[in-house]
């Protein structure tokens, strides 16, 4: 959100993100791009009947407006019958005010946006959506294409629309820099794995005000990743906010999670198995948990053995956590670090986690050094001994863990299409979204006669 029309707000927002390394978001605001050049897909042959393929219309509109302009998808239902790639954009935007629906069976992703700088993908009326009809695959234990991939894109934002019922993953942010992702709703089948909502690797990223209901991870950090602020995240029946899985060459640092609300989801699951590299300088604070299976977990024996020396994990802080796991049969705090490279400099502060079905909980630490819970203290960071510590806690902690009115208490269906719900107005108890939803009328919010519209001639 770095557009020139809001310099003071953006400056203050940047200061608020202590883990960010610099400004994020597009360099030029969407209204300026729309005023410069607008390409309405209707003028390129698109029909809002939910049946006619818009792939060529969208490609042609992008071809004319990918440098300095705005592609406009007006209200209505549109069928996308081919996977498309929109690439080489410079100071451009896509305004999604309608619903783009999967109209084919692809294998990669419906929309790939690649190699762009100063880019914005947003809904001007906060009613835009990408509809994947994923249940058609998932009910048969098969998978289809991802909905959206943002690849090698710098100085950008994605905001204000819904991604519904993906046949696979929802959004992948691949090798991205200085981006802001916010006011996003992701909803689909909640009983099937390999349906990650947001996977991201890159530099200097701000994610905020996002709600996810799916069958796998919610907002997941992959390697390499540096300088992220992830806040006001509502995982509403989901795997939760994870790091990993991590292989060889891992390089993750300076990630700040805050204001996480987990309904039947895990707030921290860091996972690897004999990879290598580093994970350091990570903060999780202000976390509310209602019913996750592993609410606070490091598992360095997870998944396939990568055959290396282990990922070095250090300087992690868990602060102000409240709530309960789904069952006392699993530890509410489980820090299982690699015996060859123990974790160190871990702080657990004011973490109050209980269990729904019990009068006790378990803390379990393996090869994890620091302060709090079952951690072992250490004077230095070299030659750390291996150990296992398991503690049973019977004193019920005193805490307040409010709930959200929209919490799901049942799995969402896998045999019927999803309706597109309105955009949420809250993503964490008591917190107002950082950016208000847009309510624009027309391309860029400009009067209909203002933009220079480029039309394709039909013969």
Swiss-Prot record:
Q: Which domain of life is it from?
A: Eukaryota
Q: Which GO terms describe its biological process?
A: cell wall organization; polysaccharide catabolic process
Which residues pair up as cystines?
A: 39-65, 218-235, 337-343, 365-374
* Catalytic residues in the record: 216 (proton donor), 290
Q: Name one Pfam family in it.
A: Glyco_hydro_28
InterPro entries linked? Glyco_hydro_28, Pectin_lyas_fold, Pectin_lyase_fold/virulence
List the glycosylation sites. 36, 64, 77, 140, 155, 236, 251, 315, 356
Protein EC: 3.2.1.-
Broad EC category = hydrolase
Name the family. Answer: Belongs to the glycosyl hydrolase 28 family.
Q: Matching PANTHER family, A to Z?
A: PECTIN LYASE SUPERFAMILY PROTEIN-RELATED, PTHR31736
Question: What is this protein called in UniProt?
Answer: Probable rhamnogalacturonase C
Native organism is: Aspergillus niger (strain ATCC MYA-4892 / CBS 513.88 / FGSC A1513)
| Organism placement in taxonomy | Eukaryota, Fungi, Dikarya, Ascomycota, Pezizomycotina
């Amino acid at each position: 959100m770095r557009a020139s029309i809001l310099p003071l707000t953006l400056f203050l927002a940047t200061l608020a993100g202590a883990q960010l390394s610099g400004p994020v978001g597009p360099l030029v605001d969407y209204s300026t791009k729309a005023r410069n050049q607008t390409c309405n897909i209707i003028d390129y042959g698109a029909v809002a009947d939910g049946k006619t393929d818009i792939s060529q219309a969208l490609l042609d509109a992008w071809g004319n407006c990918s440098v300095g302009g705005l592609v406009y998808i007006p209200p209505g239902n549109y069928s996308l019958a081919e996977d498309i790639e929109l690439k080489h954009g410079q100071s451009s935007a896509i305004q999604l005010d309608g619903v783009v629906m999967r109209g084919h069976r692809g294998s990669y992703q419906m929309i790939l946006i690649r190699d762009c700088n100063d880019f914005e993908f947003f809904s001007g009326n906060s009613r835009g959506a990408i509809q994947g009809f994923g249940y058609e695959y998932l009910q048969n234990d098969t998978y289809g294409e991802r909905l959206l991939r943002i690849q090698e894109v710098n100085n950008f934002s994605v905001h204000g629309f819904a991604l519904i019922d993906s046949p696979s993953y929802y959004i992948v942010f691949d090798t991205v820099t200085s981006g802001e992702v916010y006011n996003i709703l992701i909803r689909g089948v909640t009983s099937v794995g390999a349906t990650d909502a947001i996977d991201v690797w890159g530099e200097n990223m701000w994610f905020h005000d996002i709600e996810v209901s799916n069958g796998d991870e919610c907002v997941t950090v992959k390697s390499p990743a540096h300088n992220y602020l992830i806040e006001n995240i509502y995982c509403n029946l989901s795997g939760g906010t994870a790091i990993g899985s991590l292989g060889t060459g891992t390089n993750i640092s300076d990630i700040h999670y805050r204001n996480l609300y987990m309904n039947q989801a895990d707030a921290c699951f860091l996972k690897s198995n004999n990879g290598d590299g580093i994970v350091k300088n990570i903060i999780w604070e202000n976390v509310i948990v209602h019913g996750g299976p592993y609410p606070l977990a490091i598992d360095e024996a997870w998944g396939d053995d990568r055959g290396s020396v282990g990922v070095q994990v250090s300087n992690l802080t868990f602060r102000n956590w409240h709530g309960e796991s789904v069952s006392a049969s699993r530890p509410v705090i489980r820090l299982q670090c690699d015996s060859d490279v123990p974790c160190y400099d871990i702080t657990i502060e004011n973490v109050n986690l209980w269990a729904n079905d019990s009068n006790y909980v378990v803390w379990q630490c393996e090869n994890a050094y620091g302060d709090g819970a079952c951690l072992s203290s250490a004077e230095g960071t070299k030659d750390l001994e291996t150990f296992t510590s398991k503690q049973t806690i019977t004193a019920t902690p005193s805490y307040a863990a409010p709930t959200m009115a929209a919490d799901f208490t049942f799995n969402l269906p896998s045999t019927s299409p999803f309706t597109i719900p309105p955009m949420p107005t809250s993503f964490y108890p008591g917190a107002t979204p950082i950016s208000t939803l847009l309510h624009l009328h027309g391309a860029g919010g400009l009067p209909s006669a203002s933009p220079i519209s480029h039309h394709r001639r039909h013969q």
